[in-house]
């Protein structure tokens, strides 16, 4: 079969002769099942296990696909991105290479202000067109779920416009989009020095409007000396909780302000970056079930020296996910496979931590682990089939895309 195949709700499909890395924890590292088979009815997995255990009624499938001994994993999940935005910062990158400081670039109209200006200038349709190539690059590597943030509008209508564009992507590609409202990302020039006014006049009204329109799946913020204080973020999180929305936080990227502990106190889905996280913050996150999302693309691009405290996260039992952080300024990265290699090479994550970090734990970081992230009965049939001899190849190789096919909600998407 060629191209995309839409699932019939009553149709049963089998993927046989597969080596499964299910990521189910009860099955041990990577949840491996040799000589595996996956049965899908409509959009849902109804069996994933050894061939010998396949129920006889499922063996009489409407269509059968031979994986020819290939590895099958859950489809990948990029749980932290900013792919909806206008413009790019290539000129700024060039200036940095020539020795310009961040302050000099900002004074010249660069930095986040340039992205805000470019984003505000575009319509929803133009933002969608700008985001599609970034999204397509991720999907081509086996990604089926992408988190998308606002945060480059910094006024109510522009933040809503970004979220509308993110929602539109889901109707144009076979992908699950999870949105995060991130108006508390930076303060625009007209509110400089008046963070409280910006939150009261833009962030909170925008949040209420986004919720009313069904545009926000979660609420994010940037807790840092150059952005918002813990108290300011708390006011945003309080409103989010009153609306029944989960929260997450950019925290401890440049300093330790206690953002991770704040996030944990609100039961946040995740706290992200975390280079300056301390042991107490890691413990608070573990207790709250808040996932640590590590972002090696930003670490690499900014030439950071402070590594996230991976060992402290392990000792605390904090779950770890990884993501591209695709954004125009500090992580212009649209390869989750390269992110896997960076996470292992720069942060010393293990094979199991890396693969769980873009599947099971990434789903946990988005609050959708009940829907996707592992291969097991009851979950969405979101799968990736790879031309590899062993799972380590997904992390070890650089500039290598071994995806054979992607399956999203039971639909085959062939490369």
From Swiss-Prot:
Q: What class of enzyme is it?
A: hydrolase
Q: What organism is listed for this UniProt entry?
A: Rhizobium meliloti (strain 1021)
Zinc among the record's keywords?
yes
Residues bound to Zn(2+): 80, 82, 250, 325
Role this protein plays? Catalyzes the hydrolytic cleavage of the carbon-nitrogen bond in imidazolone-5-propanoate to yield N-formimidoyl-L-glutamate. It is the third step in the universal histidine degradation pathway.
| GO terms, molecular function | imidazolonepropionase activity; iron ion binding; zinc ion binding
Subcellular location per UniProt equals: Cytoplasm
What keywords appear on the UniProt entry? Cytoplasm, Histidine metabolism, Hydrolase, Iron, Metal-binding, Plasmid, Zinc
Enzymatic reactions: 4-imidazolone-5-propanoate + H2O = N-formimidoyl-L-glutamate
Concerning SUPFAM superfamilies, the annotation shows: Composite domain of metallo-dependent hydrolases, Metallo-dependent hydrolases
Q: Can you tell me which residues bind Fe(3+)?
A: 80, 82, 250, 325
* Cofactor(s) this protein requires: Zn(2+); Fe(3+)
Query: What family, per the record?
Result: Belongs to the metallo-dependent hydrolases superfamily. HutI family.
EC no. given is 3.5.2.7
Q: Can you name this protein?
A: Imidazolonepropionase
Q: What's a GO cellular component annotated to this UniProt protein? A: cytoplasm
Record InterPro entries: Amidohydro-rel, HutI, Metal-dep_hydrolase_composite, Metal_Hydrolase
* UniProt cross-references to PANTHER family, sorted A to Z: IMIDAZOLONEPROPIONASE, IMIDAZOLONEPROPIONASE-RELATED
Residues that coordinate or bind 4-imidazolone-5-propanoate: 89, 152, 185, 253, 330
Pathway membership, UniProt? Amino-acid degradation; L-histidine degradation into L-glutamate; N-formimidoyl-L-glutamate from L-histidine: step 3/3
């Amino acid at each position: 079969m060629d191209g995309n195949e839409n699932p019939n709700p009553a149709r049963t499909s089998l993927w046989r002769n597969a080596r499964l890395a299910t990521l189910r924890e009860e099955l041990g590292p990577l949840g491996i099942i040799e000589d595996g088979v996956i049965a899908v009815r409509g959009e849902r997995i109804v069996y994933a296990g050894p061939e010998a255990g396949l129920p006889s009624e499922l063996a009489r499938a409407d269509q059968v696909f031979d994986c020819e001994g290939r590895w099958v994993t859950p489809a990948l999940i990029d749980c932290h991105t900013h792919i909806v935005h206008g413009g790019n910062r290539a000129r700024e990158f060039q200036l940095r290479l020539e020795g310009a400081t961040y302050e000099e670039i900002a004074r010249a109209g660069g930095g986040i202000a340039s992205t805000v200006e470019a984003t505000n200038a575009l319509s929803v349709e133009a933002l969608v067109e700008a985001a599609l190539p970034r999204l397509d690059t991720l999907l081509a590597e086996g990604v089926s779920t992408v988190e998308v943030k606002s945060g480059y509008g910094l006024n109510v209508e522009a933040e809503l416009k970004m979220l509308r564009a993110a929602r539109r992507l889901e109707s144009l590609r076979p992908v699950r989009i999870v949105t995060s409202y991130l108006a508390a990302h930076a303060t625009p020039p007209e509110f400089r020095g008046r963070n409280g006014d910006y939150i009261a006049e833009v962030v909170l009204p925008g949040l209420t409007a986004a919720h009313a329109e069904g545009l926000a799946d979660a609420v994010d913020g940037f807790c840092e000396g150059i952005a918002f204080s813990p108290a300011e973020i708390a006011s945003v999180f309080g409103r989010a909780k009153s609306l029944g929305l989960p929260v997450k936080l950019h925290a401890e990227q440049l300093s330790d302000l206690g953002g991770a502990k704040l996030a944990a106190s609100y039961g946040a889905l995740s706290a992200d970056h975390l280079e300056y996280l301390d042991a107490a913050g890691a413990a608070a996150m573990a207790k709250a079930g808040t996932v640590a999302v590590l972002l090696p693309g930003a670490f690499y691009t900014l030439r950071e020296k402070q590594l996230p405290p991976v060992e402290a996260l392990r000792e605390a039992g904090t779950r770890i996910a990884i993501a591209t952080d695709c954004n125009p300024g500090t992580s212009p990265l649209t390869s989750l496979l390269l992110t896997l290699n960076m996470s292992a090479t720069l942060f010393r994550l293990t094979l199991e931590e890396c693969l769980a970090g873009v599947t099971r734990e990434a789903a946990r970081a988005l609050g959708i682990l009940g829907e996707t992230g592992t291969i097991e009965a009851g979950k969405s049939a979101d799968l990736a089939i790879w031309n590899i001899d062993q799972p380590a190849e997904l992390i070890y190789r650089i500039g290598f895309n071994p995806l054979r096919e992607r399956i999203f909600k039971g639909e085959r998407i062939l490369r």
